[in-house]
């Protein structure tokens, strides 16, 4: 604690002492002084006196000096010491003595100074009056000690100034000057009178001395004078001169400027500036460079330097003239300083400088530039030009306020010394004055060009001048083009081709090009001459040029490229301007230049670039029908020139003829006659370019150029006017292209190819050109055509295979004579192409198209047909290809199988079956056995031997080659109990739970695991329909739509009808009962009065609904009255009642009575007497006895299959048992005679029946009387020796090659291989020897396929649409009336009918005439009820038909699919063998059998069915036929008949006229098109009149038949499809329909539209707005009867439709190709559209029919199960998979299996009849 206290107390003491409050301490110095005061003794004085020797005195003086410095001497001791030694200062004394005394004085002054007093004056006087000028240093030291270095002059004031002056004269040194500085600072007032001489002396010292130290100290003295005294005015000039000189010393520059700045800050500042200006202007100082430089420096620094003195008011204008004068004599240093000074002035105060100041500055600059001519100073030159650059920058920044003209004159005067940037500014400035408002502006432009272009070597400057010239030309050429070109351009630029600067050459060439582009005078040729000289430079590199220098050399040739590209631009402009001769010359110049490339073999990259761009432009040339040339703009729209033609001159063109080829190219439309002089038209013959193109194809070495030419050629070849209006040899073009592909050295000559380049890339580029060249086939030699086809065949092995296939498809259409010879080999080659997704669509569409060209494959052997199937079958694999490809593959297989020659089909069935198994069925199987089928089944090596040999079949019992026998008897055994169709049970038991999904992409394992069952079933159903199709057509060519002749209608009138479900077929049997005969002979007056209505007519129940333009998935029958648009749909399939006269050639109507007389009679027919009423009584009685004889024994069998219907009409030839009371039927010959005899009794010979038998309708042949040899063979004739044991097979079913036995789908053991496929093959193997060629089957196309006429018919189609159109449609239609049916008889097959009969009998008295009750209709359909009286419905009973009020109408015969009559039905029990129920039914039958048998005439249909089907050991219940049990199932059959057995397509057709490409309303408003459009429509199909169409026979796609949608349209058909075209121009354009909605409701709902684009502009997808417009087939008409076909599709369709394909097709084949493209696109669109609803996928009507039949079977099963729930269903659940069980025992023989089945179960066939 003590330490802080002591510390604090110490601080306090210090503060007290500081403030003077503390106790005073004794002064130690005083005490010490008193103690140390030195006493001068006498002895000391004696030793100092003269008594002693000199040396002793000097020694003692030294000792006293030490004492005097440190100790105080006693009072008066100094005086004593001075007196003792003063004598030693005499001059005669030695210097040592003097120096010792002076040292003693210095010591006394230093040690005893404050005690000397007046002695100071004494000592100063001693120094001042020193006898000599020696000892200056010692004296100065004493003076410094006396004055404390000049600070204190006490007692010295009066004599000090004089002493200083004296001393400066003798001893002016730096030491003295330092003392003088202090004297001036501290005692200046004592020096005033002597300042001037002092300054003078110091200035002289500064000027004369060379010591920088002296000068520096002198400057300090002068600074002290200026700062602490007043510099005399008279000393100012010398003072300034001194500083001006001194400032040139580098080390003294700063102190000098500081001193000058101090001076200028005084009142003498302006005087100093003035003096310095005087110095600069004084002629006497002109040679004194340092002085002038210093003056310039000080003035510049003082007035505008970094530390300028703002007190100075001198302006730059006042001092700059002095600067100018200072430069009178050239001096590098002065000029340099002046440049620095004015540069500083300009940079810092540029905004404050006035014009006057700038004038002086420019004078100075000009003088500086002049001095540079004489002064060799790089530094000065650099700084002077930097000064000019600074001024330029001010000009650029608009901060220069002087005269720009004068400045740029300076720059121009010394332009060769100025940098490029300065000259560019100069040229820019000069260019501003070159305009017509300036006098002599053209001369100024000439001078500018002469000065800075011709005589200048710097590229940038010359380029700038060219820019100025270009700008002047651009602005003034409109009025002064003549003068500018004459005076400036040609004179100044004529030397450009020889100019050494390649950049200048390039820009000058570009200028010439720009000028020539707009020049329309004779000077154009002069300009083009210069350009041609530039282009004439050789593009070959020097031989000694090294490879690394090639790039530099190529850059020097850029002017040539500029010239060529410029000519392209000029040509593009000159095409549309006059005179046209300019365009001609440019075109010829270009062609000549490119020819030089190939002549001299230019191979530099720049040469290739020139050719690349030249060809890129020239191949854009287009021509129209008037031969006018044109080019497309940036939007692709071609604008044609009114002045330039693509042909040669008229005389040349008239004399030109084709040198080679079978035909000369047509001259096309004549060239337009010019309205003015002939010279106004220019001729640019395309042949010149064509020859260069040929050179390119033959000699080009750069792949980029060649690829460009090949890519552009196809589009150019579309414009045939280009080729045919001048001598262009397409033969040579074809030859060159083919040589490129065949020559092995083609690849060797090419360079610049990408990595991995191969012949494949070459093919990819050449094939499109060959494709486009196909349209020139008429003008190609046959040899060239064959070469083209050969090259396309060779391309099939490369990546361009898809393009080659498309090209070959076009060849097939356009060059049939060539392709027909190559086609057999080509088809075989196509089998070598791997089945990939990229090849699928082109290949399948090619085969689809080829199938419709029968004249091409009429000579095909079995190998070619097998190749087609080998190509198609792999694409049926749903795990590899999308749904469209699979469906298209099935379509191709079906088409080719139908078109295949009949003898070959049998052997193709197992081949196709195996392919389907390996590609489709096994893809859904996960069992190990499927691996054996993974090998490609369609390999040609796996074909049957009979197909590979393809020999002609021998004549014998069977015309087809022998089939391959089954190797295992168990396979044949299994076939006998299986149906050919893949049953639903087997399908579902074989399908895996994870398969391909509905996506269109190719499936992989992951997608297969997530697929849904609908798509799995779809592909299996496709396989089923394919097998069903082969069963239909393997032994026949009959169509899928049977027709019933009038004789058949007569025979089967009122017949008994039953329908069975056998596998996937519906078998309807109708037997005759004699009703037609009785009606004919008038024996049944009730029938005739009733209009002879059918007793089995279910079509009398009809309903009328308003028709809407709905999508027609299945073609429902439509019949519209003239008053309203009603669709009349009957229960038998929605087919309307016939209105008008019956078409005697209408399609077949099985099972129905053709009341021909009633249908042909007018409405008042019931009032006329019957034919039978005119007969005499005796004759009538006679004929009554023959009624049973006439028609009993006849039966009709109608088989409904997924792929169509087949019908037989047959007669029973077996004689009746002698124990029977029935009368045998009359043979057909006698029946015909009887019918003819009956006609003799008729008085009214104009009845419809008579006409139908004797007078054919218009366009319809008279039905011939059938001879006995052509009748259907009797059953007894079926039994051939080779067919014993196969009696259950019917020869009548030869076209399907199957028996009516159903396989056992419910067996516990299901083999891996589908049994249906084995059954089908077995059926072919066992039935071929059982066929009878005389089995009669009605068909519209039964002629031989080998006949050419039949080939053409197949090409046109197999479904006779034209026969479905009434040929008497113009006749007035008659009203419909419903007549009472035939008397209904009770049936022995169903107890329910008896009850119904009783009820109907009770209601008979309450009926109203004209309404037939549904119950009565049930009986009329079955044809088995009693015939005592007609049954009528009660008045209040609901009816499904509204009878027209006009009166009763005669009903037509009922129809089934496409106009077929629906089958009657019998309600029967079709359940499996159930003993209890069968006993009850048998008991009931036994009660009614006798009476029914007596009342119902004719043969029971069950008798016919059992003869064809029955086998006593068919297997379990699921194999048995199923009899349709009730009316609801009959309606299902009628619904099946509504689904046509052919695919339907509806295509929109629109015409786009000129200017309509973007207007939907204008397009829809078109009512007609061009002539070529009309021809195109004519070829699309057959023109039909809608009002005469029967919609149940002709697919109309929703078109109204009473005129609402027009009167006519076009439709087309072939064997398996129908297409209708919704043609906008044929639809009415209604004024009230402003938006054309009536048209758009059809056109907008069509998936595919054919757009005939005659507008000359591009048509864009979406112009016609619609939700379902997926694809557009765009037809663009070209010249010379050719057309361009392209496809447009929505983005989501791009994977299904190839929009990159463009086809050029002639008018002759346009309709065919467009229709094919539209049909294929529509198939793809249907697949795409149905993808959005995968639960309802119907890619074809065949599948729709198949599914309908399967649903019918399921319904029957469910109803049977419902009626007896105790019984199990026949089949396992639909989605239950039945595992396959491997057999554990050896396969039993046929006899063993038959015996086991017979023992286990003997069938009771009465259950299903």
Curated annotation (Swiss-Prot):
Keyword field: Cytoplasm, GTPase activation, Lysosome, Membrane, Phosphoprotein, Tumor suppressor, Ubl conjugation
Resulting phenotype, residue 713 to R: In chemically induced renal carcinoma
Topology of this chain in the membrane: Peripheral membrane protein
Biased composition (Low complexity): 1078-1097, 1376-1392, 1449-1464
GO biological process: anoikis; B cell proliferation; cell population proliferation; cell projection organization; cellular response to insulin stimulus; cellular response to starvation; D-glucose import; establishment of cell polarity
UniProt-listed Pfam families: DUF3384, Rap_GAP, Tuberin
Residue positions where Phosphothreonine is found in the record: 927, 1271, 1466
Main localization of the protein described in the UniProt heading: membrane
InterPro entries: ARM-like, ARM-type_fold, Rap/Ran-GAP_sf, Rap/Ran_GAP_dom, Tuberin, Tuberin-type_domain, Tuberin/Ral-act_asu, Tuberin_N
Primary role: Catalytic component of the TSC-TBC complex, a multiprotein complex that acts as a negative regulator of the canonical mTORC1 complex, an evolutionarily conserved central nutrient sensor that stimulates anabolic reactions and macromolecule biosynthesis to promote cellular biomass generation and growth. Within the TSC-TBC complex, TSC2 acts as a GTPase-activating protein (GAP) for the small GTPase RHEB, a direct activator of the protein kinase activity of mTORC1.
Record's protein name: Tuberin
Gene name per UniProt: Tsc2
């Amino acid at each position: 604690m003590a330490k802080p206290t002591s510390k604090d107390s110490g601080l306090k003491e210090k503060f007290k002492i500081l403030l003077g409050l503390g106790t005073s301490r004794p002064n130690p110095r005083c005490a010490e002084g008193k103690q140390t005061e030195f006493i001068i003794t006498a002895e000391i004085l004696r030793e100092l006196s003269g008594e002693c020797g000199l040396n002793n005195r000097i020694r003692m003086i030294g000792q006293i000096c030490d004492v005097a410095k440190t100790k105080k001497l006693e009072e008066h001791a100094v005086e004593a010491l001075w007196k003792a030694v003063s004598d030693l200062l005499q001059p005669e004394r030695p210097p040592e003595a003097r120096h010792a005394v002076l040292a003693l004085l210095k010591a006394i002054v230093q040690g005893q100074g404050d005690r000397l007093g007046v002695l100071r004056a004494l000592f100063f006087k001693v120094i001042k009056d020193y006898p000599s000028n020696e000892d200056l240093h010692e004296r100065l030291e004493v003076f410094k000690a006396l004055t404390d270095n000049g600070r204190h002059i006490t007692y010295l004031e009066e004599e000090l100034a004089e002493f200083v002056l004296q001393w400066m004269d003798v001893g002016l040194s730096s030491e003295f000057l330092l003392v003088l500085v202090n004297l001036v600072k501290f005692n200046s007032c004592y020096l005033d009178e002597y300042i001037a001489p002092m300054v003078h002396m110091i200035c002289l010292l500064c000027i004369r001395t060379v010591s920088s130290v002296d000068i520096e100290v002198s400057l300090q003295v002068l600074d002290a004078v200026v700062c602490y005294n007043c510099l005399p005015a008279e000393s100012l000039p010398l003072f300034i001169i001194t500083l001006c000189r001194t400032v040139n010393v580098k080390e003294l520059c700063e102190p000098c400027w500081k001193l000058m700045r101090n001076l200028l800050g005084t009142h003498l500042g302006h005087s100093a500036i003035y003096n310095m200006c005087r110095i600069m202007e004084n002629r006497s100082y002109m040679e004194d460079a340092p002085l002038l430089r210093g003056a310039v420096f000080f003035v510049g620094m003082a007035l505008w330097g970094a530390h300028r003195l703002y007190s100075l008011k001198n302006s730059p204008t006042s001092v700059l003239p002095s600067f100018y004068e200072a430069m009178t004599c050239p001096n590098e240093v002065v000029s340099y300083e002046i440049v620095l000074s004015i540069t500083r002035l300009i940079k810092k105060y540029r905004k404050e400088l006035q014009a006057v100041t700038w004038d002086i500055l420019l004078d100075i600059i000009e003088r500086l530039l002049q001095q540079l001519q004489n002064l060799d100073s790089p530094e000065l030159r650099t700084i002077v030009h930097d000064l000019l650059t600074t001024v330029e920058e001010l000009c650029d920044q608009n901060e220069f306020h002087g005269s720009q003209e004068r400045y740029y004159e300076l720059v121009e005067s010394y332009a060769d010394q100025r940098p490029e940037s300065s000259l560019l500014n100069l040229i820019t400035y000069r260019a501003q004055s070159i305009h017509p408002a300036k006098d002599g502006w053209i001369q100024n432009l000439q001078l500018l060009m002469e000065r800075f272009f011709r005589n200048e070597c710097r590229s940038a400057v010359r380029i700038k001048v060219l820019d100025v010239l270009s700008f002047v030309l651009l602005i003034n050429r409109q009025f002064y083009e003549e003068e500018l070109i004459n005076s400036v351009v040609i004179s100044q630029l004529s030397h450009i081709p020889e100019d050494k600067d390649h950049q200048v050459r390039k820009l000058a060439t570009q200028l010439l090009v720009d000028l020539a582009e707009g020049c329309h005078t004779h000077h154009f040729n002069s300009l083009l001459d210069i350009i041609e000289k530039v282009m004439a430079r050789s593009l070959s590199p020097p031989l000694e040029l090294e490879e690394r220098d090639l790039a530099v050399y190529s850059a020097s040739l850029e002017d040539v490229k500029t010239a060529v590209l410029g000519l392209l631009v000029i040509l593009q402009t000159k095409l549309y301007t006059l005179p046209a001769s300019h365009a001609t010359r440019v075109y010829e110049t270009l062609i000549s230049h490119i020819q030089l490339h190939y002549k001299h073999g230019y191979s530099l990259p720049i040469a290739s670039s020139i050719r690349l761009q030249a060809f890129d432009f020239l191949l854009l040339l287009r021509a129209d029908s008037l031969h006018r040339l044109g080019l497309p703009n940036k939007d692709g729209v071609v604008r044609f020139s009114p002045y330039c033609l693509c042909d040669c001159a008229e005389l040349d063109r008239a004399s030109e003829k084709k040198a080679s080829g079978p035909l000369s190219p047509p001259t096309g439309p004549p060239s337009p006659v010019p309205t003015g002089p002939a010279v106004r038209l220019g001729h640019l013959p395309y042949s010149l370019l064509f020859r260069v193109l040929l050179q390119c194809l033959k000699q080009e070495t750069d792949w980029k150029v060649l690829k460009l030419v090949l890519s552009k050629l196809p589009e150019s070849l579309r414009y045939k006017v280009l080729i045919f209006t001048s001598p262009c040899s397409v033969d040579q073009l074809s030859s060159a292209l083919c040589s490129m592909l065949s020559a092995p050295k083609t690849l060797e000559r090419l360079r610049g190819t990408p990595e991995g380049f191969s012949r494949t890339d070459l093919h990819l580029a050449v094939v499109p050109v060959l494709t486009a060249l196909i349209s020139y086939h008429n003008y190609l030699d046959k040899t060239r055509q064959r070469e083209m086809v050969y090259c396309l065949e060779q391309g099939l092995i490369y990546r361009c295979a898809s393009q080659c296939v498309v090209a070959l498809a076009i060849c097939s259409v356009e060059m049939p004579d060539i392709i027909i010879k190559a086609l057999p080999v080509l088809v075989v080659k196509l089998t070598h192409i791997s089945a990939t997704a990229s090849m699928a669509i082109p290949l399948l569409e090619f085969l689809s198209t080829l199938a419709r060209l029968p004249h091409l494959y009429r000579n095909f052997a079995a190998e070619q047909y097998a190749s087609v199937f080998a190509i198609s079958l792999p694409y049926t694999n749903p795990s590899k290809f999308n749904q469209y490809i699979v469906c298209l593959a099935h379509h191709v297989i079906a088409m080719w199988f139908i078109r295949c020659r009949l003898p070959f089909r049998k052997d193709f069935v197992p081949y196709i079956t195996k392919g389907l198994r390996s590609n489709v069925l096994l893809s859904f199987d996960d069992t190990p056995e499927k691996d054996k089928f993974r090998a490609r089944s369609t390999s040609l090596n796996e074909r049957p031997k009979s197909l590979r040999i393809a020999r002609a079949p021998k004549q014998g019992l069977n015309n087809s080659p022998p089939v391959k026998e089954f190797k295992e008897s168990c396979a044949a055994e299994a076939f006998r109990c299986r149906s050919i169709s893949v049953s639903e049970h087997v399908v579902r038991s074989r399908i895996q739970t994870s398969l391909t999904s509905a996506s269109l992409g190719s499936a992989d394992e992951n997608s297969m695991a997530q697929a849904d069952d609908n798509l799995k079933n779809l592909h299996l159903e496709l396989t089923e329909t394919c097998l069903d199709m082969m069963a239909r057509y393997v032994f026949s060519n009959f169509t899928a739509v049977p027709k019933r002749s009038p004789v058949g209608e007569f025979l089967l009138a009122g017949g008994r009808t039953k329908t069975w479900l056998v596998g996937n077929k519906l078998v309807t049997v109708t037997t005759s009962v004699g009703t037609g005969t009785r009606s004919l002979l008038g024996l049944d007056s009730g029938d005739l009065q009733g209009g002879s209505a059918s007793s089995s007519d279910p079509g009398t129940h009809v309903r009328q609904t308003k028709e809407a333009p709905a999508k027609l998935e299945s073609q429902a029958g439509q019949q519209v009255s003239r008053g309203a648009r009603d669709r009349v749909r009957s229960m038998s399939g929605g087919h309307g009642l016939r209105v008008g006269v019956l078409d005697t050639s209408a399609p077949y109507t099985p099972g129905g009575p053709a009341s021909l007389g009633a249908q042909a009679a007018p409405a008042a027919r019931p009032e006329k007497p019957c034919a039978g009423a005119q007969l005499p009584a005796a004759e009538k009685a006679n004929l009554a006895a023959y009624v049973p004889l006439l028609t009993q024994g006849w039966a009709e069998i109608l088989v409904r299959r997924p792929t169509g219907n087949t019908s037989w009409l047959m007669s029973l030839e077996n004689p009746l048992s002698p124990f029977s009371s029935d009368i045998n039927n009359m043979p057909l010959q006698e029946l015909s005679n009887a019918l003819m005899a009956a006609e003799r009794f008729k008085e009214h010979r104009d009845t419809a029946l008579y006409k139908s038998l004797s007078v054919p309708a218009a366009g319809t042949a008279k039905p011939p009387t059938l001879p006995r040899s052509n009748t259907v063979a009797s059953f007894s004739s079926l039994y051939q020796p080779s067919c014993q044991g196969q009696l259950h097979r019917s020869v009548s079913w030869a076209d399907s090659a199957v028996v009516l036995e159903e396989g056992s789908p419910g067996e516990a053991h299901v083999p891996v291989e589908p049994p249906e496929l084995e059954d089908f093959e077995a059926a072919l193997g066992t039935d071929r020897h059982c066929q009878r060629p005389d089995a009669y089957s009605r068909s519209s196309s039964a002629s031989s396929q080998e006949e050419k006429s039949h080939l053409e018919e197949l090409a046109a189609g197999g479904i006779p649409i034209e026969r479905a159109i009434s040929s008497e449609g113009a006749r007035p239609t008659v009203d419909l009336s419903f007549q009472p049916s035939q008397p209904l008889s009770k049936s022995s097959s169903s107890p329910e009918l008896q009850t119904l009969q009783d009820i109907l009998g009770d209601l008979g008295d309450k009926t109203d005439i004209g309404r037939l009750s549904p119950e009565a209709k049930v009986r009329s359909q079955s044809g088995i009820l009693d015939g005592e009286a007609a049954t009528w419905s009660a008045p209040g009973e609901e009816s499904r038909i509204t009878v027209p009020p006009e009166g009763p109408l005669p009903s037509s015969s009922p129809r089934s699919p496409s106009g077929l009559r629906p089958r009657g039905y019998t309600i029967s029990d079709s359940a499996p063998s159930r003993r209890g129920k069968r006993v009850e039914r048998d008991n009931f039958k036994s009660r009614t059998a006798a009476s029914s048998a007596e009342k119902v005439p004719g043969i029971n249909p069950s008798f016919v069915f059992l003869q064809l089907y029955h086998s006593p050991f068919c297997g379990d219940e699921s194999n048995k036929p199923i009899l349709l049990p009730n009316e609801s199932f009959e309606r299902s059959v009628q619904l099946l008949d509504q689904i046509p057995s052919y695919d339907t397509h509806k295509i929109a057709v629109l015409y786009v006229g000129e200017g309509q490409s973007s207007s939907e309303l204008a397009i829809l408003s078109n009512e007609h098109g061009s002539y070529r459009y009309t021809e195109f429509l004519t070829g699309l199909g057959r023109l039909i009149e809608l009002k005469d169409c029967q919609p149940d026979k002709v697919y109309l796609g929703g078109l109204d038949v009473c005129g609402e949608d027009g009167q006519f349209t076009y439709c087309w058909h072939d064997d398996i499809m129908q297409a209708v075209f919704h043609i906008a121009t044929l639809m009415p354009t209604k004024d009230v329909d402003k938006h054309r909605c009536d048209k758009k409701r059809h056109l907008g709902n069509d998936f595919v539209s054919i757009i005939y684009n005659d507008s000359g502009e591009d048509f864009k997808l979406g112009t016609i707005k619609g939700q379902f417009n997926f694809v557009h087939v765009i037809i663009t008409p070209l010249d010379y009867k050719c057309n361009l076909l392209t496809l447009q599709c929505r983005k989501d369709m791009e994977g299904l439709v190839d929009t990159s394909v463009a086809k050029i097709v002639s008018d002759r084949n346009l309709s065919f190709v467009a229709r094919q493209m539209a049909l294929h696109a529509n198939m793809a669109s249907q697949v795409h559209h149905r993808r959005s609803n995968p639960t309802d996928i119907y890619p074809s009507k065949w599948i729709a029919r198949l599914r309908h039949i399967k649903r019918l079977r399921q319904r029957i099963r469910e109803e049977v199960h419902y009626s007896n729930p105790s019984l199990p269903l026949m089949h396992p659940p639909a989605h239950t998979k039945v595992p396959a069980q491997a057999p554990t025992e050896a396969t039993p023989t046929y006899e063993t299996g038959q015996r086991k089945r017979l023992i286990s179960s003997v069938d009771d066939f009465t259950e299903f009849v």
